[in-house]
């Protein structure tokens, strides 16, 4: 079994826990998630299995979509409801429209200080482990981008919003910063990931449903193929001979490409090499594609 299973992660499990459950259910040795989702969060968690794990570095998960709910009046050390309150403030003087204006202003390119309770590492040690000992270390601010943000509802002190943002954005930190700007503190109470790159809730299933489908031998409908997951890459179809050549680790010749499909591809284009719709390799095109027989593509990853 090769590809991706999109899990609708439940509250309380770590991303590692989910991968372990998938590995056990599918009896797969090779499995891994494409990006951590906080234990208190729910929603889209793509898990690669088999040859799908080779595709992870080449996925386009540059855009993620979340629905979040924050509560005004308290900031916590984790920036969510699982932490300890470190600051409390009065929100009762705030008008819904002023809250809407502030929350809606968190769009565009923003500078964000990663939270101490995160998986980022300092000298090889995850920051959350240092935070649990009471230590706080300097972190570099990071540029993130919020492509869009819509306030769904305001029922003070609760505010629910949906946002589309760049990879690496901490929605917890956005909520914290919103609370600071409003002067009363805030933290997340709910976070649900609606999509991550090509993976969305429409394809997501629960761990319980995964077990049912596995026992029935009916996983084909929920398995996202590596080719579909890499659909953002230019497709280059190979002949049978070309696919065999690539599987042996050799770049294809012009004759190995079907119907002259390799012509006109700009240098630096990342490609998925296909045979009968199945990914054989990921490669980069070099300057002057097909200017010679064997050095027009640089193979990055070959799939079995």
UniProtKB/Swiss-Prot annotation:
In this protein, the active site sits at: 38 (nucleophile)
Keyword terms of this UniProt record: Isomerase, tRNA processing
- Catalytic activity from the UniProt record: uridine(55) in tRNA = pseudouridine(55) in tRNA
| Biological processes per GO annotation | mRNA pseudouridine synthesis; tRNA modification; tRNA pseudouridine synthesis
Q: What is its EC number?
A: 5.4.99.25
Is tRNA processing among this UniProt entry's keywords? yes
Q: Under the GO molecular function aspect, what terms does this record hold?
A: pseudouridine synthase activity; RNA binding; tRNA pseudouridine(55) synthase activity
Pfam family of the protein (one): TruB_C_2
**Signal sequence residues:** none
Domain of life of the organism encoding this protein: Bacteria
Q: State if Isomerase is listed as a keyword.
A: yes
**UniProt xrefs under InterPro entries:** PsdUridine_synth_cat_dom_sf, PsdUridine_synth_N, tRNA_psdUridine_synth_TruB, TruB_C
* Family assignment from sequence similarity: Belongs to the pseudouridine synthase TruB family. Type 1 subfamily.
Q: What does this protein do?
A: Responsible for synthesis of pseudouridine from uracil-55 in the psi GC loop of transfer RNAs.
This protein's name = tRNA pseudouridine synthase B
């Amino acid at each position: 079994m090769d590809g991706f299973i999109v899990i609708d992660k439940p509250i309380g499990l770590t991303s590692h826990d989910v991968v372990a459950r998938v590995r056990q259910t599918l009896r797969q040795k090779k499995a891994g998630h494409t990006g951590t989702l906080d234990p208190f969060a729910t929603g889209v968690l793509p898990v690669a299995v088999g040859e799908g794990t080779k595709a992870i570095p080449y996925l386009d998960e540059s855009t993620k979509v979340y629905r979040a709910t924050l509560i005004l009046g308290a900031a916590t050390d984790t920036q969510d409801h699982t932490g300890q309150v470190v600051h409390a403030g009065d929100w009762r003087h705030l008008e819904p429209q002023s809250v809407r204006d502030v929350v809606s202003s968190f769009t565009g390119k923003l500078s964000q200080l990663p939270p101490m309770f995160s998986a980022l590492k300092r000298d090889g040690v995850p920051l959350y482990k240092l935070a649990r000992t009471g230590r706080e270390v300097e972190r570099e601010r990071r540029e993130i981008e919020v492509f869009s943000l819509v306030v769904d509802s305001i029922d003070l002190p609760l505010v629910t919003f949906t946002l589309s943002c760049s990879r690496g954005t901490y929605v917890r930190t956005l909520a914290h910063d919103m609370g600071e700007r409003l002067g009363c503190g805030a933290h997340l109470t709910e976070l649900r990931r609606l999509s991550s790159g090509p993976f969305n809730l429409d394809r997501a299933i629960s761990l319980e449903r995964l077990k049912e489908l596995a026992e029935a031998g009916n996983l084909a409908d929920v398995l996202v193929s590596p080719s579909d997951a890499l659909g953002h890459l230019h497709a280059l179809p190979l002949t049978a001979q070309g696919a065999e050549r690539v599987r042996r680790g050799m770049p294809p010749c012009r004759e190995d490409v079907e119907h002259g499909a390799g012509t006109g591809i700009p240098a630096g284009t990342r490609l998925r090499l296909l045979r009968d719709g199945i990914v054989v390799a990921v490669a980069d095109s070099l300057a002057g594609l097909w200017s010679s027989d064997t050095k027009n593509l640089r193979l990055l990853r070959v799939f079995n």
